[in-house]
Amino acid sequence: MLMNSIYSFTLQELKKELTKNNIKAFVAEQIFDWIYSKHVDSFDEMKNISKENIEKLKQLFSFENMVVDKLQVDKHDGTVKFLLKLEDGNFIETVIMKFNYGYSVCVTSQIGCNMACKFCASGLIRKKRNITVGEFIKQFIIAKEYVEKNFNDKLTHMVVMGIGEPFDNFENLIQFFEVIKQQKGLCISPRKITVSTCGLVEKIKEFADLKNQVNLAILLHAPNNEIRNKIMPINKVYSLDKVIEAMDYYIKVTKRRVTIEYILIKDVNDSDENAVELAKLLKGKLCYVNLIPYNKVVENNYFRSVRGKQFFDVLKKNNIQATIRLERGSSIDAACGQLRIKKILELRNAKV
């Protein structure tokens, strides 16, 4: 029998599940305390739960078997990148970053990615499967424990911008948000969470209707369809005008500002004309642009732009709010998915 992960339930859902199996509802609060405050990953360690109930719990629920295969720490800014091995032998990446407001974690939503953005390492290997709710939560717990142990601090923020397209794993993603905000659990405010999408229009609208206060970032990366078609194949399904229309719907429904992510790629999308066109596209909208320095991926022929400041100045001149993202993880495999690809190639070569 395939058991449900203990990490996949909200407190109320777990209470109902326990009651259904003749275990008192209050045991759910004890379990939450053990797994989210004391960080145990075995029912046998839960000393205030009866042996009879522990045996029942072992038959009903599983713990995520996720281990750190490799750890990289940037020598300049302290960014931490984990390569995590999952129970089925797959690998994912999770990253801890330090900001002036505290520590944030970037989690992975899929094993591989089908969006196939031409500049991205994540899409070099196609999607194998979605990350489960339990695997989402376990990534956060591993990062949380690391921050508490090594930095004597708290992990307070999260972005779902790792490997994969989060909105292509919509059901698990939304349940993850419900679980992580539980007050007697990890208690992460939705306002401290940001999720990104490359532009799955129907899901942007569905996400808007939830009004769950999680922040939205749209990976635009181009000011027109011609450029976006070349670097983001998804644009041939969801064209730029449809993505902007979905963003407008999100803003209207939620009254929340959207982040526009824009990776600057040399001689592709970084000219003054591109900046002017982007400014016209976003004029009057409740959004701001996050300009991102490109991390080179050896498997493709794209390069980092040196025109970040000029591009920023053009946006500013045209009354578009923008920032240039501070580069992090420069001394490690910074590009999303790079560490995973290295591991996969290493394993393939070992078999030859």
From Swiss-Prot:
Reaction catalyzed: adenosine(2503) in 23S rRNA + 2 reduced [2Fe-2S]-[ferredoxin] + 2 S-adenosyl-L-methionine = 2-methyladenosine(2503) in 23S rRNA + 5'-deoxyadenosine + L-methionine + 2 oxidized [2Fe-2S]-[ferredoxin] + S-adenosyl-L-homocysteine; adenosine(37) in tRNA + 2 reduced [2Fe-2S]-[ferredoxin] + 2 S-adenosyl-L-methionine = 2-methyladenosine(37) in tRNA + 5'-deoxyadenosine + L-methionine + 2 oxidized [2Fe-2S]-[ferredoxin] + S-adenosyl-L-homocysteine
Q: Which residues cross the membrane?
A: none
The protein's enzyme class? transferase
Question: Where is the catalytic site?
Answer: 93, 336
Positions that bind S-adenosyl-L-methionine: 164-165, 196, 295
Positions with a binding annotation for [4Fe-4S] cluster: 113, 117, 120
For this entry, list what GO says about its biological process: rRNA base methylation; tRNA methylation
Do you know which InterPro entries this protein is assigned to? Aldolase_TIM, Methyltransferase_A, RlmN_N, RNA_MTrfase_RlmN, rRNA_lsu_MTrfase_RlmN/Cfr, rSAM
Q: EC number(s) for this protein? A: 2.1.1.192
Per the annotation, how and in what number is the cofactor bound? Binds 1 [4Fe-4S] cluster. The cluster is coordinated with 3 cysteines and an exchangeable S-adenosyl-L-methionine.
Would you indicate the residue range of the signal peptide? none
**Keyword terms, alphabetized:** 4Fe-4S, Cytoplasm, Disulfide bond, Iron, Iron-sulfur, Metal-binding, Methyltransferase, rRNA processing, S-adenosyl-L-methionine, Transferase, tRNA processing
SUPFAM superfamilies according to UniProt? Radical SAM enzymes
Q: What is this protein called?
A: Probable dual-specificity RNA methyltransferase RlmN
Q: Which species?
A: Malacoplasma penetrans (strain HF-2)
